[in-house]
Swiss-Prot record:
Residues 1-33 are annotated as: Disordered. This is Transcription elongation factor A protein-like 7. GO terms for biological process: negative regulation of DNA-templated transcription; negative regulation of NF-kappaB transcription factor activity. GO terms for cellular component: nucleoplasm; nucleus. It comes from Mus musculus (Mouse). The gene is Tceal7. It is found in: Nucleus. Plays a role in the negative regulation of NF-kappa-B signaling at the basal level by modulating transcriptional activity of NF-kappa-B on its target gene promoters. Associates with cyclin D1 promoter containing Myc E-box sequence and transcriptionally represses cyclin D1 expression. Regulates telomerase reverse transcriptase expression and telomerase activity in both ALT (alternative lengthening of telomeres)and telomerase-positive cell lines. Belongs to the TFS-II family. TFA subfamily. InterPro entries: TF_A-like/BEX.
Length: 98
């Protein structure tokens, strides 16, 4: 069972009258969480705006990027083929050492 703020500090429950301006134990924590939430929300909003800006490229710019991406993918494919060939040569040489 959870104790009230006053009990945690070692004071009896009814020894002090609560003032209206006092905040309950979880109020500060709630404000911190709300602040963190707002910060994350603002950050995600900024990231979203940046993403939207990138969607408005001209067709020429996108074509250039697509070609570059395709070249990179082709290079990756060729490197994978080379690695497979090297790996298969290495395993075959282990099978028959002489």
């Amino acid at each position: 069972m959870q104790k009230s703020c006053n009990e945690k500090e070692g004071k009896p429950k009814g020894s002090e009258a609560k003032r209206e301006d006092e905040q309950p134990c979880g109020a500060l924590e709630g404000q911190r969480l709300e602040g963190n939430f707002r910060q994350r929300l603002l950050q995600s909003l900024e990231e979203f705006k940046e993403d939207i800006d990138y969607r408005h490229f001209k067709g020429e710019e996108m074509t250039g990027e697509e070609e570059e991406m395709e070249r990179c993918l082709e290079e990756i494919r060729s490197l994978r083929k080379k690695f497979r060939a090297l790996h298969s040569n290495r395993t075959h040489s282990r099978d028959h050492p002489f």
